[in-house]
Amino acid sequence: MRYIMNSLFKILYLNRFVEYLSTNTYILDIVKIVMGVIAIFASSQITIPIKPVAITMHSVILCIIAFTYSPRLSFLTILTFIFIGVMGLPVFCQFSSGINYFLGSAGGYYLGFLIGMPVMSVLKGKLAENYLNVTIICIIGHAIFYLCGIIWLASMIGLKQAIYSGFIIFIPSGLVKILIFSCLFSYIKNLKRK
């Protein structure tokens, strides 16, 4: 009997906790940020290690966050990810961390994420969410990511090499990731309608 009472209490307490989360937006926002950071971390570890910047699955997760979070929340999520990485938690590509990694060849892309994610979130709110618009918004976001990355890399290896190493070699994988996200987003949206 005692076991049953304890189990019921836990279930009731869990229901109250879920109710509390749904009414307290600050806690819900914190939970979303933590979940987003974990997702970005996990996608950071799926890499094709090329130099000077590895290809990762970041951008698919960043698009998901940009399309499901508000502009403010998407910005805070990537800012939190960058902050904990710079502070030493090994969340960056291939479990890297620290200010030296951030100031290295990938730093410009992270700054691009800070700008591009809120831009995608804002555009998502302004345009109808169909396959074409979703794809265009993702291309705009990726253009911001790559532009910041190229500018950052150019200060280290020169503009011509930065365009090649920081953009051209990423075009095929970037297009594939955008298409994956666009198809995934359309599929999820169709599921919601049913």
Curated annotation (Swiss-Prot):
<comment type="function">
    <text>Probable biotin transporter.</text>
</comment>
<comment type="similarity">
    <text>Belongs to the BioY family.</text>
</comment>
<feature type="transmembrane region" description="Helical">
    <location>
        <begin position="102"/>
        <end position="122"/>
    </location>
</feature>
<keyword id="KW-1003">Cell membrane</keyword>
<protein>
    <recommendedName>
        <fullName>Probable biotin transporter BioY</fullName>
    </recommendedName>
</protein>
<feature type="transmembrane region" description="Helical">
    <location>
        <begin position="73"/>
        <end position="93"/>
    </location>
</feature>
<keyword id="KW-0813">Transport</keyword>
<keyword id="KW-0812">Transmembrane</keyword>
<keyword id="KW-0472">Membrane</keyword>
<dbReference type="InterPro" id="IPR003784">
    <property type="entry name" value="BioY"/>
</dbReference>
<dbReference type="GO" id="GO:0015225">
    <property type="term" value="F:biotin transmembrane transporter activity"/>
</dbReference>
<feature type="transmembrane region" description="Helical">
    <location>
        <begin position="30"/>
        <end position="50"/>
    </location>
</feature>
<dbReference type="Pfam" id="PF02632">
    <property type="entry name" value="BioY"/>
</dbReference>
<feature type="transmembrane region" description="Helical">
    <location>
        <begin position="51"/>
        <end position="71"/>
    </location>
</feature>
<feature type="transmembrane region" description="Helical">
    <location>
        <begin position="134"/>
        <end position="154"/>
    </location>
</feature>
<feature type="transmembrane region" description="Helical">
    <location>
        <begin position="165"/>
        <end position="185"/>
    </location>
</feature>
<keyword id="KW-1133">Transmembrane helix</keyword>
<dbReference type="GO" id="GO:0005886">
    <property type="term" value="C:plasma membrane"/>
</dbReference>
